[in-house]
Amino acid sequence: KINPELNYIKKSPYNKKNLFKIDKKIDVIIFLPDFSDAPHIYGKGVFNDFSEWIQETVEFLKSNNLSIAIKEHPNNWIYSSKVFKNKLKNKYKALTWLSKDISNLAIFNKKPIFGISPHGTVLHELAYHNIIPVASGPNPYMSYNFVFTPKSKKEYFVLITKAIQNKLNFKKNHKEKIAECYYMYFLHNGDYIK
């Protein structure tokens, strides 16, 4: 059964039954990709693969003394993705690890400073909730100005530094443009019909 909100996952990331209380502070939320997905589906990214991305990102954030939370991808059911996620959890035990079943609303209610995803739909969700979204490379929202998209690894870490320092020029209330983007990407896009 496919979720009517997002046609590639089974469960809604906004399930109100899963509004578990998150006790810890969250400065930055990292949304893991499905590690079996193509890392360069939208063009050549600034990292070679998801492994390089997540490890360099976490190390950089740790050096800035931030409260970091990581949420696994809702489609994390493929064995190789689970194995890699478990290796990350063992390596970064001090971080807050959130289940894929926790509603994104519970996360957004914690008001993190910013959120990071390689190219996930959560980027427009973050912007919708007025939380700074930072991608790690090409993504479906590059034509819009509500997601920060780097062109190089150096620029990626500059964007994160500026987000930490509250120096990114993030204009809030992009709801109309986000609705347009959502329509074009999920409802009007014929790729899913073929």
Language-model segments: which ranges?
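Nucleotide-activated donor-binding/catalytic signature segment of Leloir-type glycosyltransferases, i.e.
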Residues: 83-99
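Short acidic-hydrophobic, aromatic-tinged amphipathic segments that line or gate anion-handling sites
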Residues: 96-100, 147-162
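Conserved catalytic-core segment of nucleotide-activated headgroup transferases in glycan assembly
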Residues: 2-87
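C-terminal amphipathic helix plus adjacent low-complexity
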Residues: 1-24, 154-194
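A donor-sugar binding/catalytic signature common to diverse glycosyltransferases
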Residues: 100-148
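Short, structured coil segments at secondary-structure junctions
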Residues: 64, 91-93, 111, 129-130
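Flexible loop/turn segments at secondary-structure boundaries
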Residues: 36-40, 75-80, 104-107, 123-125, ...
